[in-house]
From Swiss-Prot:
Part of ribonuclease P, a protein complex that generates mature tRNA molecules by cleaving their 5'-ends. One of its GO terms (biological process) is tRNA 5'-leader removal. This is Ribonuclease P protein component 1. It is an enzyme of class 3 (hydrolase). The lineage of its organism: Archaea, Methanobacteriati, Methanobacteriota, Methanomada group, Methanococci. The gene is rnp1. It is found in: Cytoplasm. Belongs to the eukaryotic/archaeal RNase P protein component 1 family. It comes from Methanococcus aeolicus (strain ATCC BAA-1280 / DSM 17508 / OCM 812 / Nankai-3).
């Protein structure tokens, strides 16, 4: 089960997400469902028009919906291949 404490080591595909901050202002407020993830990007299928958008992880802050609560994660913490991120030991530097 995904919790705010293990989200960095969990599969992200299928989660609802919103971009809350980004260096690219046109991405802020984008909402959708994660459909694909690579080492440096996350692909989101938008809720409003079902188009797929590729978001670089290092320029954004993501707000994930977990059950009925929300958690914000800095995109740089998600960098790396998904299968390697699941194995990587993560320091407890991110306050929840």
């Amino acid at each position: 089960m995904i919790t705010p404490y293990n989200i960095l080591r969990h599969e992200l595909i299928g989660l609802d997400v919103e971009i809350t901050q980004s260096t690219n202002k046109s991405l802020v407020g984008l909402k959708g469902k994660i459909v694909y993830e690579t080492r440096n990007t996350i692909n989101i299928e938008r809720f409003d028009n079902s188009k797929e958008v590729m978001i670089p992880k290092d320029i954004a802050v993501f707000k994930f919906k977990l059950n009925e609560e929300y958690i914000e994660v800095i995109g740089e913490l998600l960098m790396g291949r998904p299968e390697d991120r699941l194995k990587r030991k993560i320091k407890n530097i991110y306050p929840y």
